[in-house]
Amino acid sequence: CEDLTVDSVKIRNPYYAQNGDGIDVESCTNVHIHHSTFETGDDAICMKSGKNAIARRIEGPCSNVYIHDCLVNEGHGGFVIGSEMSRGVKDILVENCTFVGTDVGVRMKSALGRGGVVENITLRNIHMSEIKGEAVILTMSYVLNSLNRNETIAMENEEDIPYFRDLSMDNIEVTGCRQFTKLEPLQGRPETIRNVVVNGQKLA
């Protein structure tokens, strides 16, 4: 899709709803989400672009997304990318948002087999409170359903290796969390997460 606007929308799902995401933006470009409220049983605001090899043939990237002045009140993740991101997610700006009582604040998740690149992601002026787990987690170990039962992925198959790069997070304020940041690149491939800066500190 192209030219998607979500303005002043309130989305509520039961806390126990399996896969009860608020909004999943998949392979869309020119997206504006603002002044909206989310209370969900899973990820609240999520960017995606398809899963594994089939997505790399038929889907397009998720790109040019502007999210601002949104409230996430409970849910699994406040702002999330993945794990379906095989065609890439890029050029995203998230600012002036509040996450309260979520399991994690910001999560970017993928796994070997997904492929794709997440890049040029900016978050600023994000306020979090009562976060149950990590405020910010970037993980390549999200393996749930990442491979088909009859599919084998080899590390040397470059198109199956995902990357997170050029991620900037500034003025991230957190009141209450188990851990502020956590980075989990692919085992033996530290370069799969690189150029990550949070509140002026370079983490990768």
Stretches found by the model and what they are:
Residues 1-204:
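Extracellular/periplasmic carbohydrate-active domains that bind, remodel
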